Amino acid sequence: MSIEYRPWREDDDLRLLEVWPDAPSAPAQAFRARLGADDDAAFSRTLAATDAGVPVAAGVVYESPWHPRRLWAYVEVAPDRQHEGIGRELLARLRKVAADAPSSVTALRSRVTPGSAGESFAKAEGLTPAMRSRVVRVAAGALPEPALGQTADGSWVRSVEDLATGSVELTRAVWEFYRSVHDWDPVAEIGIGAVNRQLLSDTAGAFGALVLRAGAPGSDGPAPITAFAVSYRPFDPQDPEDRATRFEAADVLLGYVPGASSGDGSAREAGAAVETLLALLVRDYPVELEVDDSMTPLVAVVDNLLEAGVAHVVTETVTLVDDRV
């Protein structure tokens, strides 16, 4: 065996597909899409490992504009060539080329599925688990419909409003949530327009939003947002009107506004807010939510539904990090 390591070439993706199986997970599929020619504008470097000129493995390291403290890293080796040290050598070489990153960042992160060969490899190379993420499907009717609006004495408790995904108010709420749940992987300073394009635009697939407000509109304007739900659904060319079916699960970003509630009960109140919106969403249709363990109030709601048997985990991934420099 004479393994050579070289930069990526144009047809390497097609040649690797001959020796790689189908992508075993969504993270692997996403990482494969990042394999490619060197990019200096958005720093990215890909290396391939070849045996007698035939690619058998590849790896990539690249910057994340939103999370600049670490570089993403990924290595994949053909199944019949694993445990030969190829992956380890690729990663070592990627660490060296990472030193060329304009940011001078050399700390790494990667995402794997629990129990996978990728997880074992990453841990063996010194990466440690930092965050678990789950996609959870919640069944239609999983929660009773909540009471909204005015109480018997005429006072307002909470209200729900449809809000345009281009709303600055909504964008700020989503951004506050996103930043708060990524303390473990700090976010860069991103302009509000870029946040909207990335998370709430037509390009992002967002097509509707609900917000929960803490009361009724007052003379000073609308009550503050306490929770939000943004729906996404991939476009289906066979259904250009994008009609939902009874058992189709919408992809939903469900979150809360940090600090919208005060005092010791803030986490509990945030949980109640997202549970209220979730109850409205699943009245007729199931939904799928991505839940990171850092989303503590939402985790509590989802774990209760899992325990009750009205929700199940669709996928689970773990982000591992290596902060060595």
Feature roles, as predicted:
Residues 9-11, 20-107, 215, 220-263:
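Conserved donor-binding loop and adjoining core beta-sheet/short helix segment
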Residues 137-166, 299-301, 305-325:
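C-terminal "cap" of GNAT-fold acetyltransferases
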Residues 181-214, 221-325:
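Hydrophobic multi-pass inner-membrane translocation pores used for secretion
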Residues 23, 27-35, 40-42, 65, ...:
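Short, flexible helix-coil linker/hinge segments at the edges of structured domains or between repeats
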Residues 88, 96, 100-106, 110-133, ...:
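Conserved active-site alpha-helix within GNAT-family acetyltransferase domains
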Residues 73-75, 108-112, 289-291:
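Conserved hydrophobic beta-strand within the GNAT/NAT acetyltransferase core sheet
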Residues 1-35, 48-50, 147-191, 324:
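Short amphipathic alpha-helix that is part of the acyltransferase structural core
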